């Protein structure tokens, strides 16, 4: 994630040798970061956030182990042919067949690739449970945070692509995706079966300009919320301001201008999700096919970023900053009795940097990373007004486990002062922020199979109000991710 994504076209048209080199590097790379990201996002973001979408978002692939990198061209070639069939235009990389459980058994993928069709599917299953003895268990209907009761969630995806470059469209592609999700606790859901994406993509001017339009999930197009393949930021801070997500895609047109092979500017004109949040959006539009929902307007997003991929002696770096403006009509938390009003907005700033390379020559992306994120939105229109995150993580921490990842993430979520003051005026116990420290270890068990375990301590895991029994939580986090 901290480098130029492999499924995005290189904005500079390199020589044939450079193109071949990139193709070989991709094919030998098992997409570790993507899987780790998908695992960690759900188990951590739901650890305290009251309504986090289960759609996981994904990060780009990490380097393969030494054995894979030492493999011959004969080993690499069988999977290189699928690179053009992976979804394009994302900041993250969904894995290729080399890191799936079925790869190309029975020749099904090969036969489809011959006619320009590619596919990837995955199942993501998460579990959270507060381990403190006074966990204040409740009925599921009255559950206030993820883990208060043992909480299970599953999200299942299928993405199919069709290659239009075979007809002369530069990097052309059609993408169709579906998603099914289920939660034992419905508030972060709800359950649904529906559209994940329906998109058209192509490039212009020798890949200087990228166009993607259709029903998009912009959580995978902007912000890079799964930093370095780890837990990632709490996406709810941006979802509340209208950004579309895996379970809530909306019509959008995205344009990305590559100033060079590292510096870019990306903009989107997107139909906002419901101003009442992801739960209201999915409840009103579970299929994801409706053009709009009640009170939803237009969201404009602009992101400026700098990406530099890890190489021998060159650290992995990703810097980005963005703003968003939403014309949807929101409830005013400062005066709930007045009419809804427009003018919501948000901003975000994030940076990730490789601090040390543990395998400079063999796998330069392995090593220790650090990063931070800051997100903000007006407190009168958003329950989350500020979000801060610090992270430290190690990719390929051991030579014997070159595809694993260890992460330590600290977060602070500041709640709207108007929502807090209103709760205090009613005599309720209320808190102005939520703090969490989360540690996870994610293991790559086999091609296409990942598992993660972690602990997350959360001070005030509920949203705005709490009881003496819900001030603290120590969530056990377990997740699996299987690609096919």
Set out the residue ranges of the language-model regions.
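Short loop/turn motifs that connect adjacent beta-strands in outer-membrane beta-barrel proteins
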Residues: 96, 102-119, 131-132, 161-173, ...
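Transmembrane beta-barrel strands of outer-membrane/channel proteins
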Residues: 119-127, 174-180, 211-217, 267-271, ...
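Surface-exposed loop and membrane-interface regions of Gram-negative outer-membrane beta-barrel proteins
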Residues: 128-154, 166-201, 292, 461-463
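Outer membrane beta-barrel transmembrane domains
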Residues: 276-294, 299, 303-305, 323-341, ...
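Outer-membrane beta-barrel "beta-signal"
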Residues: 470-484
